[in-house]
Design a protein with these regions (language model features):
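C-terminal regulatory domains involved in ligand/effector binding and gene-expression control
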Residues: 1-75, 197-206
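Conserved short beta-strand edge segments in small beta-sheet-based binding/regulatory domains
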Residues: 158-163, 190-206
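Short amphipathic alpha-helix segments
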Residues: 139-157
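Short amphipathic alpha-helices in soluble, non-transmembrane regions
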Residues: 148-154, 181-190
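Active-site beta-strand/loop microenvironment that shapes enzyme catalytic pockets
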Residues: 76-125
Length: 206
């Protein structure tokens, strides 16, 4: 499973020209169902807008879709999709809402507006790398907690809050196939008593 880049959550970018407002809303979406749901959400919130143009890219089936939503062909959805393509990001959708200002922009003006609004939303987004990771946990005595914590951090593990009961349970995530040396260190630290569980790999921002 290969790493890929996407965004975390949502982001907004705006552009205005000749009193027309272009509001680009960007969202993480790792399936067509999620992309369509976000599109419908934006449409419902902007029913009085003249256009709700969209473009999305999904890893699932290497899908790319766009719609000019009534704008002249290739002046709206196409430039928005091209911005997403050039970013190298995937599993995301952008919906650009246009509130018409009463003046026509022409083909060049529309392409510029939809390109700029989408680019500004991308600039505002938090870009993350999604990797194949595993979730691990280990139970250690209180006396070994700090040293185990240091080992995990030094190995690049992303730690969750520990659980303090009669012993300490440490939980963390790390990229798949990198956990081997750390597991050896934990066994050495606990003299072979560490009971470490390792999950099946899954994708997560890391």
């Amino acid at each position: 499973m290969e790493d890929y880049r996407t965004i975390r959550g949502t982001a907004i970018g705006e552009y205005e020209e000749k009193k027309s407002r272009f509001i680009a809303q960007l969202s993480f979406a790792d399936s067509e169902e999620k992309a369509v749901a976000f599109l419908e959400q934006v449409r419902a919130a902007n029913r009085t807008a003249r256009h709700n143009v969209y473009a999305y890219r999904l890893r699932e089936g290497s899908r790319e879709r766009y719609s000019d939503d009534g704008e002249p062909a290739k002046t709206a959805g196409t430039p928005a999709l091209e911005v997403l393509q050039h970013s190298g990001l995937t599993d995301l959708i952008v919906v650009i809402t246009r509130y018409f200002g009463g003046m026509l922009l022409g083909t060049g003006g529309l392409v510029r507006a939809y390109t700029t609004a989408t680019s500004r939303a991308l600039e505002a987004a938090e870009v993350v790398t999604v990797r194949s990771v595993v979730a691990l946990d280990v139970t250690v005595d209180y006396g070994l907690y700090e040293r185990a914590d240091l080992l995990i951090r030094a190995a690049g593990g992303k730690l969750a809050e520990p659980e303090f009961i009669d012993k300490v349970i440490l939980r963390w995530q790390m990229p798949e196939h990198t956990e081997g040396p750390l597991l050896t260190q934990l066994q050495e630290l606990t003299r072979g008593t560490a009971n470490v569980t390792v999950s099946e790999p899954f994708y997560a921002a890391f």
